[in-house]
């Protein structure tokens, strides 16, 4: 289905939980967030019904996010349910990687095709600091397990943070030289905890391009939020995602579903459409509600305008 700006919307990002086993400083408060009542959260079966309705509108690509999706009970069975839907061509997951050593093989067998891993430092002490207790060795083990299983290229999502990991950018880039890894640097977005925490820590990805002049530009899919580069002779790629300095709204192909049953036409807007009621009381209207969300997508985000409202959700509740 196309939106009002002739963009083909074929990608659904689904946050299946806002809970997480880490407390990253730019994402979640140290005390965590209040756990929602069971009745407020979509069941995995209900989410599956929404995806089935989405296929009828042209959705063929699904990404599972959180919070941390691997803490949700039944995650492997859920991936299996989604992979059994006729019309779904691609299933991916975004995770912090801590639980991948336990789940990666079962997830692949269930139908998972691709994995993105959020990792902001290769230094165990710095990683533990920003995640408030995370064990980097488990993440690295998870990355290697995904490579072993052929869930490649493994994509590493690195939030570029001034005064924290800007001295590790070269180390991350070097990972792409001899491994099937794509490292993607993401500009720090002013959402939730990061709206205050990150005010003086923003790094433009343009700085990375200027610093590393040996990166060779590559052809990139129009719908990809990343501009890709490669080290000469490298196995993997270096991606730059610039939601602030150079937005990619013109080719946006996605709609987001939150764990509490809200459709978000735009990541950076507080506009939401409730689909929980339709799922539970009027299942024949699920597709209609989905279509209305697609048709309400704005032409572009208003992050840099005076009219922008601070997000009413933290990133852990949206899933990026």
Curated annotation (Swiss-Prot):
Pfam families per record: Fer4_12, Mob_synth_C, Radical_SAM
Required cofactor(s): [4Fe-4S] cluster
Keywords attached to this entry: 4Fe-4S, GTP-binding, Iron, Iron-sulfur, Lyase, Metal-binding, Molybdenum cofactor biosynthesis, Nucleotide-binding, S-adenosyl-L-methionine
Keyword presence, Nucleotide-binding: yes
Note on how the cofactor is bound: Binds 2 [4Fe-4S] clusters. Binds 1 [4Fe-4S] cluster coordinated with 3 cysteines and an exchangeable S-adenosyl-L-methionine and 1 [4Fe-4S] cluster coordinated with 3 cysteines and the GTP-derived substrate.
GO annotation terms (biological process): Mo-molybdopterin cofactor biosynthetic process
Domain Radical SAM core, residue spans: 4-227
Name of the protein in question: GTP 3',8-cyclase
Protein encoded by which gene: moaA
Residues reported in the UniProt entry to bind [4Fe-4S] cluster 2: 249, 252, 266
Catalytic activity: GTP + AH2 + S-adenosyl-L-methionine = (8S)-3',8-cyclo-7,8-dihydroguanosine 5'-triphosphate + 5'-deoxyadenosine + L-methionine + A + H(+)
Binding site for GTP: 13, 63, 94, 155, 254-256
Enzyme class: lyase
PROSITE patterns: MOAA_NIFB_PQQE (PS01305), RADICAL_SAM (PS51918)
Listed Basic and acidic residues bias regions: 300-312
Quaternary context: Monomer and homodimer.
Residues bound to [4Fe-4S] cluster 1: 20, 24, 27
Residues covered by region (Disordered): 300-320
Native species: Alkaliphilus oremlandii (strain OhILAs) (Clostridium oremlandii (strain OhILAs))
Positions of S-adenosyl-L-methionine binding: 26, 67, 118, 189
Free-text function comment from the UniProt entry: Catalyzes the cyclization of GTP to (8S)-3',8-cyclo-7,8-dihydroguanosine 5'-triphosphate.
The enzyme's E.C. designation: 4.1.99.22
CDD domains linked: Radical_SAM, Twitch_MoaA
InterPro entries: Aldolase_TIM, Elp3/MiaA/NifB-like_rSAM, MoaA, MoaA_NifB_PqqE_Fe-S-bd_CS, MoaA_twitch, MoCo_biosynth_MoaA/MoaC, rSAM
Family classification: Belongs to the radical SAM superfamily. MoaA family.
Pathway: Cofactor biosynthesis; molybdopterin biosynthesis
């Amino acid at each position: 289905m196309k939106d009002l700006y002739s963009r083909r919307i074929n990608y659904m990002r689904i946050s299946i939980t806002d809970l997480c086993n880490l407390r990253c400083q730019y994402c979640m408060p140290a005390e965590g967030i209040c756990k929602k009542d069971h009745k407020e959260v979509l069941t995995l079966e209900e989410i599956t019904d929404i995806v089935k309705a989405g296929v009828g509108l042209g959705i063929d690509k699904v990404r599972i996010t959180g919070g941390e999706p691997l803490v949700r009970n039944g995650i492997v069975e859920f991936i299996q349910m989604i992979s059994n839907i006729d019309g779904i061509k691609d299933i991916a997951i975004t995770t912090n990687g801590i639980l991948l050593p336990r789940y990666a093989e079962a997830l692949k067998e269930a139908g998972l095709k691709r994995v993105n891993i959020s990792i902001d430092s290769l230094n165990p002490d710095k990683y533990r600091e920003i995640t408030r207790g995370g064990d980097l060795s488990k993440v690295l083990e998870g990355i290697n397990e995904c490579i072993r299983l052929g869930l490649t290229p493994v994509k590493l999502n690195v939030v570029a943070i001034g005064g924290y990991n800007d001295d590790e950018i070269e180390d991350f880039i070097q990972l792409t030289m001899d491994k099937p890894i794509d490292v993607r640097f993401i500009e720090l977005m002013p959402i939730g905890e990061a709206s205050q925490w990150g005010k003086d820590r923003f790094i433009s990805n343009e700085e990375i391009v200027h610093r590393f002049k040996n990166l060779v530009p590559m052809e990139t899919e129009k719908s990809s939020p990343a501009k890709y580069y490669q080290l000469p002779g490298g196995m993997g790629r270096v991606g730059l995602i610039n939601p602030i300095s150079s937005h990619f709204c013109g080719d946006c192909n996605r709609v987001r579903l939150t764990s509490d049953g809200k459709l978000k036409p735009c990541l950076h807007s507080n506009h939401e459409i409730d689909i929980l009621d339709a799922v539970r009381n009027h299942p024949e209207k699920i597709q209609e509600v989905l279509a209305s969300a697609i048709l309400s997508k704005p032409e572009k985000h208003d992050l840099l305008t005076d009219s922008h409202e601070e997000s009413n959700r933290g990133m852990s509740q949206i899933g990026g």
